[in-house]
Regions:
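Adenine nucleotide-associated cytosolic modules
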Residues: 1, 6-217
Length: 217
């Protein structure tokens, strides 16, 4: 059955058919994101897609901190943050989303406050818990377009990998050790996954934590 458009949009609307009004950026958003909009590959349509995007960050530490701020500044509309830690003074040398004023606070709430102060367009969904096999399905069920993996341990990285493959969610994976850093994008079913490259974690002595081996701020 094909409905008639005779009578135009007014009749279509009056008859109760579905419709969607075109969305436009507000004047404030056009000003805030003007440097994005000037890029032909982005424009207003691309900026609207960023505002509609949902990104889940695993960790609000040395990797998650700058990632969260730049994603928020870019106008990614919804950021989920998973972290069970609290802000410690040893974090402040590199975890720039936190501050002296938030020492002792849960990292997810400290990050939420900073992100919302930076860009009120962004909604922050805090998960004050460590990602585990018991909660990963619940968290991913909230619907995420991309996962940013800034975890500081291998069990979590493998868990993120396995869940992302199952749910077909791309993962941006970051890691750092002292002066070295790595960034990799894993797109499930479009290329190899993290476990494909590293079937098992390295022995602990080859992968010390930041607390054990240090890290540049």
């Amino acid at each position: 059955h094909v409905s008639s458009m005779a009578g135009g949009f007014a009749d279509w609307k009056r008859n109760g058919y579905d419709f969607e009004l075109p969305r436009a950026l507000s004047p404030e958003q056009r000003s805030r994101y003007s440097r994005h909009i000037l890029i032909p590959e982005v424009g207003e349509e691309g900026q609207q897609r960023l505002l509609d995007a949902r990104v889940l960050l695993i960790g609000a530490g040395g990797l998650g901190s700058p990632a969260s701020l730049y994603l928020a500044a870019a106008g990614v509309g919804t950021l989920g943050i998973v972290d069970a830690d609290i802000v410690d003074d040893s974090n402040l040398q590199r975890q720039i989303v936190h501050s002296t004023n938030t020492l002792g606070e849960p990292k997810v709430l400290s990050a939420k406050r900073a992100i919302e102060a930076l860009n009120p367009d962004v909604t922050v969904v805090p998960y004050e818990e460590r990602l585990t096999s018991e909660n990963v399905e619940r968290i991913l069920a909230d619907g995420w377009d991309v996962i940013v993996d800034g975890a500081d341990n291998f069990p979590t990285r493998y868990l993120v990998n396995d869940a992302s493959v199952w749910h077909h969610i791309p993962v941006v994976h970051g890691s750092i050790y002292r002066f070295e850093g790595q960034v990799t994008v894993f797109h499930p079913h479009a290329g190899p996954c993290y476990r494909c490259l590293y079937p098992s974690p390295p022995p602990p002595e080859l992968a010390p934590s930041c607390a054990e081996g240090g890290v540049l701020g």
